[in-house]
Amino acid sequence: MKKYIIELIGTFFLVLIIGLTENPIAIGLGLAVLVYMGAHISGAHYNPVVTLAMYINDQIDLKESCKYIASQLTGSVVAVYTMIELGQDSFSVVSKTTEIQSFFVAEILFTFLLVFVILNVALNKSLKGNQFYGLAIGLTVTAGAFSVGDISGAVFNPAVSFGPSLLSFIDPQVVGSNISSSDFFVYFLITGIIGSVLASFLYKKVFK
């Protein structure tokens, strides 16, 4: 049970930080802190595509993966409602001028990078016991946010888009982008899965 609570709490604060600030440094450092907080309990996934990568690399079974993802999505929804209570009435992720093709390329590339970094710093035997894993993961998100934040919103995490997408069915203004509310979560899910699967199989077949 502790693992699922940590996944919910970690995802909650990650989504909350992203929703309340667009500063890539704050987001990256926030993620790093959350990773250090939960790594020894749940592995600190906070991201369905990270859980998918761990499943592909035999670190977690299917039943456990589903429970992790349910916890992450719940944390996302609670975070969005908390943002509203704090006065944040919109969640603008994708630029209204972004082309869908550019969005897909940006999200796939940097989701791949994020998952590949996580697999290497968390699973690689030569780096076992390292203390920089949290910073490596957080700084990867920071680099991605600076690089493609204006193109895709630099989400790299379907859980981050799940809460706003669900709420946007109630109020379409919650998500400020050129992507319709019905497609918002689906697009991030597709790009996340593609990036994660590519990184996972490359790591498993070549670098593990």
Predicted regions and their residues:
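Membrane-interface helix-loop junctions and terminal tails of multi-pass membrane proteins
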Residues: M1-K208
